[in-house]
Amino acid sequence: MAGAESPTECQAELEPVVSLVDVLEEDEELENEACAVLGGSDSEKCSYSQGSVGRQALYACSTCTPEGEEPAGICLACSYECHGSHKLFELYTKRNFRCDCGNSKFKNLECKLFPDKSKVNSCNKYNDNFFGLYCVCKRPYPDPEDEVPDEMIQCVVCEDWFHGRHLGAIPPESGDFQEMVCQACMRRCSFLWAYAAQLAVTRISAEDDGLLPNATGMGDEDVSKPENGAPQDNGLKEDAPEHGRDSVNEVKAEQKNEPCSSSSSESDLQTVFKKENIKTEPQSSCRLQELQAKQFVKKDAATYWPLNWRSKLCTCQDCMKMYGELDVLFLTDECDTVLAYENKGKNDQATDRRDPLMDTLSSMNRVQQVELICEYNDLKTELKDYLKRFADEGTVVKREDIQQFFEEFQSKKRRRVDGLQYYCS
């Protein structure tokens, strides 16, 4: 029929057009993500000798420790060397963990990189992630039965991963938040609600009209009000003793994409606190107590926190004691954040990554450098023009096309060299 489009034309219209630039940009983005997650971890040496590492990339081996067995985690190097052909669960990063590879939890495997390990690592913490299950729904990721596109977000406290729709509070549309604290951890660390009224990206205030739906469809809220201007404990007695005696300097250096020079473990923070190596100010008010004196709302929902929110937490002696009792002293450590870990990885990779072109240039004299740069620019220009023809025509670039390009390029180069005439003065 006249005017009808052929099946090929229809298919061409339906298929998305991806340029070479798009492919290169996507490849670079994936490489940067990999560097961020893996760059801060050693890919050749087992991390066991470092003790409980402040933060590192971790994996769980479903082949060696399937569901029903004791959970175990392995470091990046062991995932390559000892479990290369096994089914692994990628756990992203976790804090204060010591590699389990080859210990008593692995019945038929000895670690190739560090075989002399203790039977168990009693300080390690495990959850359902080590069996490939995540969120309150306890489902795998990716979930073949879940057709709803949803982002998985990691809780900064328990380090479990959650679907955005199961957090009781919708993630900010802009994605402009650094960390999230899940519903269960907000219940356990209820002191954070006083900070949430001032710091959370989606602020929780007494003037909020609606209730945010939580994972079970409920939206409970508790408005805490001061009585006669006096500070209230707001149900925080179970979290910690009364606050507000000696306080420490709360002003911390803001983290602006610079990595922390070292990772402090939870045990390090405990040691610092126990030895009272904290500079105290003269008696002044506790920041948490000041916030609790104001009206704020507690909800059964997750909270989302901005960059550097941890530096705003009170670090007086009573608050530090409370953090220790709740096992969240890491919240006072800016180096504990995933962002700090990722930035360290990126910087380490940038330092280690050598540019072969720059290495070649540095080994040449000035004349050779100029000639090489000119040749490089010629190649770049001609290759761009050559590929543009395929883009304009909508045709696929084949291996033979690239071979033909370089043959023609070399031929042109030989003609230019052969055509040069040298004169002696």
Swiss-Prot record:
Record Gene3D superfamilies: Zinc/RING finger domain, C3HC4 (zinc finger)
UniProt cross-references to SUPFAM superfamilies, sorted A to Z: FYVE/PHD zinc finger
Disordered: annotated span: 212-269
Enzyme class: transferase
InterPro entries linked: UBR7, UBR7-like_UBR-box, Znf_FYVE_PHD, Znf_RING/FYVE/PHD, Znf_UBR
Entry keyword annotation includes Ubl conjugation: yes
Pathway where this protein functions: Protein modification; protein ubiquitination
Function: E3 ubiquitin-protein ligase which is a component of the N-end rule pathway. Recognizes and binds to proteins bearing specific N-terminal residues that are destabilizing according to the N-end rule, leading to their ubiquitination and subsequent degradation.
Protein name in the entry: Putative E3 ubiquitin-protein ligase UBR7
Gene: Ubr7
